[in-house]
Amino acid sequence: MVLPLVLRRVSVPTIRQGVKRGVILALLAGAVPIPDIQATRQTPAATAFICPMHPDVVTRTPGTCPRCRMALVPSDPFDAREYIVETAARPSAPVAGRPFRLRLTVREPTSRAVVRELVEVHEKRFHLFVISQDLALYQHVHPEQQPDGSHVIDLTLPRPGVYRLYSDFLPLGGTPQVVPGVLVTAGADPDLAAPLHLTTDTAPHVAGGMRVSLTLPPDGLVAGRDEKLRYHIEDAATGEAISDLEPYLAAFGHTLVLSGDTLHYVHAHPLELLPEPGQPVHGGPDLTFKALLPKAGRYRVWTQLKRRGVVSTVAFTVDVQSPSGR
């Protein structure tokens, strides 16, 4: 069943967390005119153009991001409202191992009207992450929009339990949203406060014929600091460094970082960009992801890579220390 709760955006800094902070700082620096804040809250309208992945890139006019070449999108940086996502599963209590349909409806927070216009980000308008309560199971899927404006996806969950849903989207003229939800299958013990026992795991992992190694900063990961997660990828059979990674959703990789309490979420992409049009499109063997992790604790890291037409996922568990604990 889907728990009857009002879903709100994750109140955490994410890779997109700087959207409001970064854009507002740019506005105060004179990058774009400052609108009437009260009027903006009542009648949101685009007042700037931002990069969905680098929110401190702000301009008055359309264009592309100088860092990632992603198209800038219209945004109202003073629209701090949290959009609503209504979820409905059919059957209402999905059975593990059997397909079911999940419908997600994005609603405007004031009028509660269905939001139909979402901006395409990394080739999709709606990114949905489905993660088991124990952080062992992970899916990154893309619901399709229906004539009524809702988004639908058919899923199969491998085992009973509580699953966290993260709806990641950008309303046209608004700011990026990450809206959390909860899905409970038939036969699950819906103890949302159950303690989580994660063990640190930074050893190399093999998936899709690739051996993926993760290197952390020499002094470890520190909360509140821009960090770099560095990956080296080899062929699992030969041990040779690979150079044939393929683009997946307009990037050479996708990484999701989630805190053990499931409250802090980062969706990141490699610093290594896809080549210019007309150039060979192959990546590897090294990729670097930037992440700002807001608090100390243990985090689960999933990274998706595509090679030879197959998307594979590797998972690591890392510790983040507090600045005072260094």
Annotate the PLM regions:
Residues 2-326:
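Intrinsically disordered, low-complexity terminal tails/loops enriched in metal-binding residues
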